[in-house]
Each structure stands twice: as C-alpha cells, then as structure tokens.
Amino acid sequence: MNLEVGTINSTLCIGFKGKNNASSILAKNISEDSCLLTNSFSGLQRDIEALNFYYDCVVLFGIDKSLKDAVRIEKAAEKETKEFSVLNLEKLSAQLAALGISNYLSENPTQYLCNDAYWHLLRKFNRKVVLIHIPSIRNISENFINRLSIAFR
C-alpha cells in the first residue's frame, strides 16, 4: 500500500501488546519488523522514545470495539495540540475501498491510548504516520485480518 509522501522505502507497522489483541496480530502478519506498544500511557511513551530507526511511514493499528468488518482512518491526534498526518489518507481510503475493505476517515480522535500513541508518533516521525482503528478480536473475522494484511504488505 503506497501512502505517498514521496517514495515509501520503509514502513513500520505498530500494534498494541496483548495475546488477543487484533492490532498485534495484524502488525505481525504484515511485517516481521513490526513493533508492539505497551498498553499504558507511560509504557507506550517509553516504547516510542526507544524507536531510533528512520521510517518513511508509520502505520499504527488500534482497536475500536464498536467497529465490525470496517476500519476508521484517523486524520489527527489531539493532546496539547492537534496534530494532523501529512500522508494522503483520502488515497489510502480509496485504495482500501477498491480492495473491498469498508472504511471511513475521521478528524475526531478518541482520548485514549491510541490517540496518545498517535500524537507522539506524529511528532517523532514528522507527521508521516496514520492511525487505523480496526475491530476487536471479537468483531473481526480471520478473512478480514487477512485482507488487511495483504493490503498493507
């Protein structure tokens, strides 16, 4: 999946730790070089600070229990300031739709771990980051995880 900010040479996929966390399953399915964040505010900040490789693009997967076989692409994170991704998220949305993956764009970030991680990642990686909320393990089919994995390889 080309997220376009020039030529993408290396993409880091990030999920959250947890045995039954769909974001960790998806991140690992996409890339062996994936990273899993700790499920606490202080832990995820330490994890993000420890990332010292340069990536052209970062894709963060988070969970939204209200989603079912659809994803929500977050345009922004809000903490002390509202930070926006510079990636072409409209194009990403169209590419996912063309692959039969239901999705929608949002500018209203949640105020939980995913938003916090997204905000820190946007600042660390020059806003070349996207947060994609996916369904929880209870609301996501294996087929849907496989289609998402293929889309982001």
Regions found by a protein language model. Give the residues of each.
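Conserved beta-loop-beta element that borders a ligand/cofactor-binding pocket
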Residues: 126-136
